[in-house]
A protein has these predicted regions:
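Conserved nucleotidyltransferase catalytic core and NTase-mimicking acidic/glycine-rich helix/loop elements
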Residues: 4-130
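Aromatic/basic-lined ligand-recognition segments
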Residues: 1
Length: 131
């Protein structure tokens, strides 16, 4: 992913912050790293985010381990409340996946301004400057 990895993490963390921090920071970083560690070339941010958000609900349904210590990182999501934090995080990730698809459709239809509005609402202040 070359130099795209840190900005990508910042954008996904921006989404997380805008949603009330449903996923702990290191847990999120670990999922992003695991998702993209084998990518050999950089893609556009919009397509990269779309793929990640489409896969994020599945990652949230599975155990996640610290790559160094092998400690479980996602136990906080199962806090015994109803609905669990895991369910809430998955629902937020599914909505994000839907929004990224919608933004991509607007881009493909030549409606960049509408796509930008969706990205801004999704990523907050971490949406890259446009223009």
């Amino acid at each position: 992913m070359d130099g795209c990895f840190v900005p990508l993490i910042k954008m996904v963390k921006g989404w997380n912050r805008e949603r009330g921090w449903p996923i702990r920071s290191f847990h999120l970083e670990t999922m992003i790293y695991e998702h993209y560690k084998n990518y050999e070339k950089a893609y556009t941010y919009d397509s990269t985010l779309k793929v990640f958000f489409n896969d994020l609900p599945g990652y949230l349904r599975s155990p996640c381990y610290d790559p160094v210590t092998s400690d479980r990182l996602d136990g906080y999501l199962d806090n015994g409340t109803n609905p669990t934090k895991r369910t809430e995080a998955i629902e937020k990730a599914e909505r994000a996946a839907s929004k990224t698809s919608e933004a991509m459709e607007y881009t493909e239809a030549g409606k960049e301004q509408k796509a930008i509005e969706i990205w801004e609402s999704l990523l907050g202040e971490f949406f890259p400057a446009y223009g």
